[in-house]
């Protein structure tokens, strides 16, 4: 989830942003990205299983957002990013189906190539369901110490 007050820094310094979940955030990133820079790669964050504790747009908003965001200059909308509830393996299949369904709404469908889902504990199931990018921080660095 990207906050409005962080977009300028992200637009100037990064090549990828995974937490775009609203049109206003994409518009800000687009307007703040330098013309001289490569387009900013973004993934639309989707709350695939409706968790109250998670950010992301609703699945029913995705087609419209893909249509709108894929037309913005200086951005390259690459795909979806989802973080389902633990042990909700059905959400991976739901995300894959949504990813395929909304491709036709993309202004540049050849850019639509990234389904970011799965973490250290469920990466095998995510990859089996079609994930092209996984987050493996725990596998690399160990579990977080929340007591600090």
Predicted regions and their residues:
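Conserved alpha/beta-domain cores
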Residues: 1-121, 127-129, 141-143
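Gly/Pro- and small hydrophobic-enriched strand-loop and loop-to-helix capping segments
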Residues: 131-148
């Amino acid at each position: 989830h990207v906050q409005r007050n962080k977009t300028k820094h992200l637009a100037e310094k990064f090549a990828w942003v995974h937490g775009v979940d609203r049109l206003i955030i994409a518009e800000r990133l687009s307007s703040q990205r330098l013309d001289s820079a490569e387009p900013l790669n973004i993934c639309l964050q989707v709350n695939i299983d409706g968790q109250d504790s998670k950010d992301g747009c609703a699945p029913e908003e995705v087609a419209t957002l893909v249509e709108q965001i894929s037309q913005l200059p200086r951005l390259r909308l690459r795909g979806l990013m989802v973080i389902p509830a633990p042990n909700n393996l059905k959400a991976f299949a739901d995300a894959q189906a949504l990813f395929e369904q909304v491709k036709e709404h993309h202004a540049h469908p050849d850019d639509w190539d990234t389904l970011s889902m799965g973490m250290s504990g469920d990466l095998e199931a995510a990859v089996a369901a079609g994930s092209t990018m996984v987050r493996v921080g725990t596998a690399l660095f160990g579990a977080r110490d929340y007591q600090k």
